[in-house]
Amino acid sequence: MTNSRVLETAAAGKISSAVTTQLLEKGVPTRALVHRNDARSNRLQALGAEVVVADMFDIQQVAAAVDGVDRVFFNPPYHPHVLDSAVAFAVAARRSGVEAVVALGQWLASPEYPSLMTRQAWLTDQLFELLPDTAHVAVDPGYFADNYLKLLPMASQLGVLPLPTGGGRNAPPSNEDIARVAVGALLDPHRHDGRAYRPTGPALLSGAEIADAMGEALGRRVRHIEIPNWMFMKAVRVNAKRLGFDVFVQSGLRHYLRESALGTWEVGGPTTHVRDVAGVEPEDFLTIARRYVGGPETRRTAGNFMRQLWNFTLTGIVPMHRLDKFDRLQQHPQPAQPRLAAQSAIWRHEHGSAGRYGVLRTHPASPSQHVA
């Protein structure tokens, strides 16, 4: 494996940078594709990565980035035209004779899903499977620990975790464990060819248990507050700049939030895929949370307290984004009968006994065969 060069896309991001770092630690030659040079890319270069700057939507730049590599970790941009990027990489991989593609996808991916990004994740998975003579492995996590920990500043300052769970539980994985599964697949892609893995944490947690773990990491009591999805989405709008959530991200998030009450994150979880592929036990939520508590926004200062209190107040004032209107104005296509994952017979078939994650996948059934 040490003679095989691996390309990681979106290498400055949290998951891809972890993939790059872990590969370098194992002595694997890496090429880190970034959108621009900055402190993050400089760090990867200092660790020994070859850093290339490329636009993931430009086929010529993509082809140049792929040329000379043997394996690709495809981490898609969260963008309405993400499928264009996937096609560009598939074409480049085919022309360059890439040996393997390990692609980061979504546990919710379905051709019926109301989120454009999630439907395109499903199509991307099908696309890479079509590449002849190229091993393909899917890494499809659900709702990450990182998503919950974006609320750590409020938990630190106000002692509350306002989160809509609908009574559902989740076993959220760390970015590092997601990366470990991807690295395991990249090191031995032919062993994992045709498989889909869903990294999770070691235990299903309720909202209250997530709040308790945050509180232990912070050294203070944190109380989970069940709030409706619409209120959470207003809070996301208030904090959108800090979170890095543009309107397209918010349009998808509103659908993902509804899955918790339907038990979607509990289906098949927790998995053993981190242990099976990476050979280590998955990190528990408390361990993950402790890595986040040193940030400047979690420090107990008067300024941070007032900032979080003001954001909390703004949540009750600002109007909601009209996200359905946004989708229409952006001309985002919709399936004839959009369904959440838990409501989709296709999704249940692909994620149930006929298409179990971690074993060789069956080809997806035709949508016409699964009418709910």
Model region roles, listed by residue range:
Residues 201, 215, 230, 290-294:
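Short amphipathic alpha-helical surface patches that mediate protein-protein
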Residues 54, 227:
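Cofactor-binding loops of NAD(P)H-dependent oxidoreductases
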Residues 46-53, 161:
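Active-site regions of enzymes building and remodeling cell-envelope glycoconjugates
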